[in-house]
């Protein structure tokens, strides 16, 4: 299991300061919509300058018509990030288009499909999709697997179910991780490290418990020790 730290702070200075404090660790860093829209490609370069071995997960959740998604995926692949994501609900054709486009690169990034956002609870989800989170997450994951993607973004609770219907090597990345039982915040389906391990999760994304800590490096050290 690998750790991905969310760079979700209000300014580029704070995010870079956090990255610098973690430069000695073999970790992934997640750059989301807010940070990328505000700070752009330059921010990605600055992260790599701090530690060229940092792995970057660009969390933009592409969702559009197939050709537009493929065009955007090609531009992302040119950025040199190691992983990015798209929405599975865009459909299998869109997912296949993305994979065909990124596979042209010598070192293509990993591509993950978002199944069900961890901010949904069951009631909210049913009101939109008229189905359970588990059923829909499995359906989206199966389609992503068949489309040739590398894995999915899901909650801890769907991770092992998804591997059972796809492959043990099909990546599951889970947000909403509260390593040692911290407050859930705006996430609904959260879990700790032990449950993530039990459910065969490959990547855990941790944000607030790290960047709101007095000593983020200490928290990262503790998490890595428990992986």
Curated annotation (Swiss-Prot):
GO terms for cellular component: cytosol. Substrate binds at residues 8, 30, 59-68, 118, 178, 187, 207-208. This is Orotidine 5'-phosphate decarboxylase. It comes from the Bacteria. One of its GO terms (biological process) is 'de novo' UMP biosynthetic process. Its EC number is 4.1.1.23. Keywords: Decarboxylase, Lyase, Pyrimidine biosynthesis. Catalyzes the decarboxylation of orotidine 5'-monophosphate (OMP) to uridine 5'-monophosphate (UMP). GO terms for molecular function: orotidine-5'-phosphate decarboxylase activity. The gene is pyrF. The active site is at 61 (proton donor). Gene3D superfamilies: Aldolase class I.
């Amino acid at each position: 299991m690998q750790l991905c730290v969310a760079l979700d702070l209000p300014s580029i200075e704070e995010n870079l300061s956090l990255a610098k404090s973690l430069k000695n660790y073999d970790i992934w860093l997640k750059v989301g919509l807010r940070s990328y829209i505000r700070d752009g490609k330059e921010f990605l370069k600055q992260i790599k300058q701090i530690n060229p071995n940092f792995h970057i997960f660009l969390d933009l959740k592409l969702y559009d018509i197939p050709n537009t998604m493929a065009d955007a995926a090609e531009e992302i692949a040119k950025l040199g990030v190691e992983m990015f994501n798209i929405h599975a609900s865009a459909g299998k054709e869109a997912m296949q288009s993305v994979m065909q486009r990124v596979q042209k690169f010598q070192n293509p990034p990993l591509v993950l499909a978002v199944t069900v956002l961890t901010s949904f609870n069951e009631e909210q989800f049913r009101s939109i999709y008229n189905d359970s989170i588990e059923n829909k997450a499995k359906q989206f994951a199966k389609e992503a697997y068949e489309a040739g993607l590398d894995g999915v973004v899901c909650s801890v609770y769907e991770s092992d179910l998804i591997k059972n219907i796809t492959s043990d090597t099909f990546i599951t990345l889970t947000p909403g991780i509260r390593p040692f039982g911290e407050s859930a915040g705006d996430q609904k389906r959260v879990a700790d490290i032990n449950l993530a391990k039990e459910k065969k999760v490959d990547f855990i994304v941790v944000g607030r418990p790290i960047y709101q800590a007095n000593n983020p490096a200490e928290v990262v050290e503790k998490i890595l020790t428990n992986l």
